[in-house]
């Protein structure tokens, strides 16, 4: 009896008939095994690129760390100028009001508060704005000089005027103003000292311009380095 082209009891090799796909199957298995043993090109590329990516990230972190250190030093310098302006204004208004009480307290507050206000304002409105909004160079310089005027001159002057005016009223070191003319009386009394505050005003504008130029130069330098490394 013949079943599927060969007799019963005979093997396919003996009859000379080879089933379709019997010789191709071992070749396919061998190719699959060889491909399975070798790593794919994408994995090799990933292994080669990984050290390069890590090196670029480390360099970028180094650039950002150096940039942060430079900005912190610059903010501290700018805040120190505001602190000296506060000390100068406190000295002038204490002489104006002839106050000799609480010297350490007033000098400490007039040195610390302008310093902190300048550092915080410079961080928020110059550095953070420079990296988030990408403001222009002119805008950066304008903001920095405005911070120098407000936090380095107007704020310490008003603070020294208020603190020493209260001490003068408390200890009666100067004649009290008449009713209804308090502000005019104090302004007339401190007219000379207010004119002398033009000295720190000029310095704070100058330091503000230099501060803005410095922050923008550091930002541009770091940006160029990171783009070049990428």
Curated annotation (Swiss-Prot):
The chain crosses the membrane at residues 72-92, 110-130, 141-161, 199-219. The keyword Signal does not apply. The modification Phosphoserine is found at residue 34. Disulfide bonds: none annotated. Its main location: mitochondrion. Keywords: Chaperone, Disease variant, Membrane, Mitochondrion, Phosphoprotein, Primary mitochondrial disease, Transmembrane, Transmembrane helix. As part of the MCIA complex, involved in the assembly of the mitochondrial complex I. Participates in constructing the membrane arm of complex I. It is linked to Mitochondrial complex I deficiency, nuclear type 29: A form of mitochondrial complex I deficiency, the most common biochemical signature of mitochondrial disorders, a group of highly heterogeneous conditions characterized by defective oxidative phosphorylation, which collectively affects 1 in 5-10000 live births. Clinical disorders have variable severity, ranging from lethal neonatal disease to adult-onset neurodegenerative disorders. Part of the mitochondrial complex I assembly/MCIA complex that comprises at least the core subunits TMEM126B, NDUFAF1, ECSIT and ACAD9 and complement subunits such as COA1 and TMEM186. Associates with the intermediate 370 kDa subcomplex of incompletely assembled complex I. Interacts with TMEM70. This is Complex I assembly factor TMEM126B, mitochondrial.
């Amino acid at each position: 009896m013949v079943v599927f082209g060969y007799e019963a009891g005979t093997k396919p090799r003996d009859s000379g008939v080879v089933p379709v796909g019997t010789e191709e199957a071992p070749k396919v298995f061998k190719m699959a095994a060889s491909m399975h043993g070798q790593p794919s090109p994408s994995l090799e590329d990933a292994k080669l690129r990984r050290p390069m990516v890590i090196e670029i990230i480390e360099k970028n972190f180094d650039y950002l760390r150096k940039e942060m250190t430079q900005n912190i030093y610059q903010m501290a310098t700018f805040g120190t100028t505001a602190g000296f302006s506060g000390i100068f204004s406190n000295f002038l208004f204490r002489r104006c009001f002839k106050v000799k009480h609480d010297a350490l307290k007033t000098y400490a507050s007039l040195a610390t508060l302008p310093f902190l206000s300048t550092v915080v304002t410079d961080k928020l409105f110059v550095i953070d704005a420079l990296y988030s909004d990408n403001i222009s160079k002119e805008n950066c310089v304008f903001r920095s000089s405005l911070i120098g005027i407000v936090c380095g001159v107007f704020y310490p002057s008003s603070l020294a005027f208020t603190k020493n005016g209260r001490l003068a009223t408390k200890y009666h070191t100067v004649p009290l103003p008449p009713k209804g003319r308090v502000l005019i009386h104090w302004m007339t009394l401190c007219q000379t000292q207010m004119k002398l505050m033009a000295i720190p005003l000029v310095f704070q504008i100058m330091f503000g311009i230099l501060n803005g130029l410095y922050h923008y130069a550091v930002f541009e330098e770091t940006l160029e380095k990171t783009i070049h490394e990428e």
